[in-house]
Amino acid sequence: MEGATGLRVLLCLLPLLTLQARPALGLATGRPRGSEKRHAVDTSVNGVSIKSLKVNCKVTSRFAHYVITSQVVNNADKAREVAFDVEIPKTAFISDFAITSDGKAFIGDIKDKVTAWKQYRKAAVLGESAGLVRASGRNMEQFTIHITVGAQSKATFRLTYEEVLKRRLMQYDITIKVRPKQLVQHFEIDVDIFEPQGISKLDAQASFLSEELAAQTIKKSFSGKKGHVLFRPTVSQQQSCPTCSTSLLNGEFKVTYDVNRDKLCDLLVANNYFTHFFAPKNLTNMSKNLVFVIDISGSMEGQKVRQTKEALLKILEDMRPVDNFDLVLFGSKVQSWKGSLVPASNANLQAAQDFVRRFSLAGATNLNGGLLRGIEILNKAQGSHPELSSPASILIMLTDGEPTEGETDRSQILKNVRNAIRGRFPLYNLGFGHDLDFSFLEVMSTENNGWAQRIYEDHDATQQLQGFYNQVANPLLTDVELQYPQDAVLALTQHRHKQYYDGSEIVVAGRIANHKLNTFKADVRARGEKQEFRATCLVDEEEMKKLLRERGHVLENHVERLWAYLTIQELLAKRMKTEGEERANLSSQVLKMSLDYHFVTPLTSLTIRGLTDEDGLEPTIDKPLEDSQPLEMVGPRRTFVLSAIQPSPTAHPIDSKLPLRVTGVDTDPHFIIYVPSKEDSLCFNINEEPGVILNLVQDPDTGFTVNGQLIGNKASSPGQHESTYFGRLGISSPTSDFQLEVTPQNITLNPSSSGSMFSWRDQAVLQKDGVVVTINKKRNLVVSVDDGATFEIVLHRTWKGSAVHQDFLGFYVLDSFRMSARTKGLLGQFFSPLDFEVFDLHPGSDPTKTDATMVVKNRQLTVTRGLQKDYSKDPRHGAEVPCWFVHDNGAGLIDGVHTDYVVSDIF
């Protein structure tokens, strides 16, 4: 970060799941905002200001969808370098990234990593990386892109990523690390939570705010299934002192919540996908058999062994009298404290603590011998002592290095451990520091029903060790199996778990075979403290109908993507343990699902068309490996220059399952309205005659207007509906004395005063009084109007020899920021927030489509689920957009009737 040339505006946000709160660095003290007089302050740094920075997190049934949007403005008289700098959790998958600058849109394409690597082989040969995402800490990955923003220009960044929230220690955590490094004109964190089980608690805190300022700026509420947190500080509330131009936003913003546990388990079904949440309450803690296997080789010298001893002493204090335990130490030789399990009596615990305080380091690393000794102790207890066979057995191993003594072949060690445990109990591996093969520890743990965790060499390593132990300290059930009717379920995620711990949650997802919902149920079998556990879960169909009415397409989309996320994660875990043909088959499955669901995973990359660095390379977004080098250890960074958007030779339409975020009109003419609050789209057609001019956008406050004239086919068959398209668009801004006329043949600036004319064969950037027009040869043009809006016009070419069809235009809204709330028009009226509810889903007159009842604008309409094409990103092929189709020229959805939007002139 340091030593970078040029200006860097850092937009740093870190949403991640945390086990423990982490101390924020360089925090400014929050100050009361009472009687202190605030002065107007310049929010820019070297002429560059962050106009807006917004984090939107929408959680539906544990599935979290994040969108980070930031707009920077360069008011300087020369170009500046700007950095968009965001940290995201390692468990998340990026699903979209886009930049809009100077009226140009730069869109990400997800493709297989092999194809992406071939395009960037030059960087690989040079030993450099064009990658934007790198490992940067314990639970995070850092996404950074540097771009050059022209003088008097702006750039908007939008990053989207998704993950499934994991319950730890009785709650779900969302932590957002805030570090903009300068004052932000419009700063906002908006967290919206919908949990069908009902929310039992919700809290939000900011480490960088005083209690008084937090009370003023953090709004939090929850009722029933819904929870909401909003943090929107003013510029004065961001200032570190009344006259300062520096920001106190430097630290963590943390949201925690949990859900009601009134049922033993909850089944959620939507669109033939299901999610099963299992976290029963009021269960008795099981006694446990616990063996710690500790590395005491010479490399543990110093702080590592001191912190390990501190953690072990605290863990021993917390053990219950019903537990049994032993300690195994391995260096060059292997030694155990007792050689067998002993009860956790006060006398035994004190003796064990004395043993921990006294042991010293010795020799190399006989990891294989240490593990086999620990396994032997647990196996012997289960086989020869009936009273010790019922508790939950747990093996925990801590090491900081690689095997150097005894058996050192990793594949043989894996085989030895697997054959010794034989699925009887879980093995948890803790890797201390970076000087070890962490993937080896991961494979070993996952092969034996556990997981691996890295312990970072830091002042809080003791707390990290204790934090891990707290997650497994209280087993409630063992040998948990969630069972479903065999013929009713497809593509099931992991449904057998060796142990279930207090404060956690088991989540299973899958697909339901067609027409099998009536027979769908879940049976749970497990072993509890001295008794068997049995439960049956049924789908509450009435409750599901109610949930679908409340959440509609968002619920359907999130349940399916939750299944996809879990499936990909599990396939990747299996892939890590396999080789040869089996590994290739798993890779193929992961790749297909990653492309289908638009996820950046270890097998895919996201490239950004139109951005190039000094070597002509486009940036690429990859998923870094867990063992990849930290950010400060990698090579030189690369700065990308925004160039005209060009078709990607490997671009492919985004899968039709994805809800694409577009508002626009194209083809016959089909209007698509994206509704962010629902993560869904509405659509309607307008049927009018060729020659009719329709008003698309009109802002009465500024006079900004967009009109479009319809054209028909060259020829039509008698008695058939005549298709119409937009063949002419007129954009005008009276405040800028600006007019633009666009046809499939020409682009004319200020036609009424004989202005300049361009063709679609040109590549040009035009600028007039705050309006920028970018012509991208034979593809599209983008109009950016000051801070008001950004629009795209797409060119559609038909076959030159066609006797029926002719060329036409599509019109899309990329940004309606700052347009007035009074904006009207067939598209403009939807720039303001819109809400709707959909219910009573049923087969329509077309058996392949679903009809439903929609309530919108206090009107009740019949709508049909369908698909429309969005050509904004791929003018040739387009991408299918699921939407609710409103019949009869949008009647009931649009204000008035469609003929109210007929105007007499293109301007």
UniProtKB/Swiss-Prot annotation:
Modified how: Heavy chains are linked to bikunin via chondroitin 4-sulfate esterified to the alpha-carboxyl of the C-terminal aspartate after propeptide cleavage. The S-linked glycan is composed of two 6-carbon sugars, possibly Glc or Gal.
VWFA domain span: 287-447
GO terms for cellular component: collagen-containing extracellular matrix; extracellular matrix; extracellular region
PROSITE patterns documented for this protein: VIT, VWFA
Keywords: Glycoprotein, Phosphoprotein, Protease inhibitor, Proteoglycan, Secreted, Serine protease inhibitor, Signal
Aspartate 1-(chondroitin 4-sulfate)-ester: modified positions: D668
Residue ranges annotated for the VIT domain, each copy included: 34-163
Tissue distribution of the protein: Liver specific.
Residue positions assigned to the propeptide: 27-31, 669-907
A Pfam entry, by short name: VIT
InterPro entries, per the entry: ITI_HC_C, ITIH, VIT, VWF_A, vWFA_dom_sf
Record-level Gene Ontology MF annotations: serine-type endopeptidase inhibitor activity
Sugar-modified residues: C57, N282, N285, N585, T650
SUPFAM superfamilies: vWA-like (SSF53300)
GO BP term, example: hyaluronan metabolic process
Subunit structure: I-alpha-I plasma protease inhibitors are assembled from one or two heavy chains (HC) and one light chain, bikunin. Inter-alpha-inhibitor (I-alpha-I) is composed of ITIH1/HC1, ITIH2/HC2 and bikunin. Interacts with TNFAIP6 (via Link and CUB domains).
Function: May act as a carrier of hyaluronan in serum or as a binding protein between hyaluronan and other matrix protein, including those on cell surfaces in tissues to regulate the localization, synthesis and degradation of hyaluronan which are essential to cells undergoing biological processes.
The protein's name in its UniProt record: Inter-alpha-trypsin inhibitor heavy chain H1
Species of the source: Mus musculus (Mouse)
